[in-house]
Amino acid sequence: MTHIGSLLLDAATLMVTGMAVVFLFLTLLVYLVQFMSRVIPQEVPEAAATPKKSQKVQPVTDSVSPQVVAAIAAAVHQHRSATAKQ
């Protein structure tokens, strides 16, 4: 019975030692990060560059050119005639 008791005592000692080491490491890490945030200045975003206006501005047209309409109509007609034969 003393053998099991000494093993449990060793396990508890190892567990407490491990938890203490992890606690100390994390505490040190928190303070180190806080220190670095005070020492190192924050990054300042660069001022947004004003976009240059393009020299060539094409006029916007709401109508579609007749060539495009004819091409679309021909493509639709060809598609319908090809699917009707199947």
Swiss-Prot record:
Catalyzes the decarboxylation of oxaloacetate coupled to Na(+) translocation. It is a single-pass membrane protein. Heterotrimer of an alpha, a beta and a gamma subunit. This is Probable oxaloacetate decarboxylase gamma chain 1. It comes from the Bacteria. Its EC number is 7.2.4.2. It catalyses: oxaloacetate + 2 Na(+)(in) + H(+) = pyruvate + 2 Na(+)(out) + CO2. Its main location: membrane. GO terms for biological process: sodium ion export across plasma membrane. The chain crosses the membrane at residues 11-33. HAMAP family: OadG. It comes from Vibrio cholerae serotype O1 (strain ATCC 39315 / El Tor Inaba N16961). Its cofactor is Na(+). Belongs to the OadG family. One of its GO terms (cellular component) is plasma membrane. InterPro entries: Na_pump_deCOase, OadG. Keywords: Cell membrane, Ion transport, Membrane, Sodium, Sodium transport, Translocase, Transmembrane, Transmembrane helix, Transport.
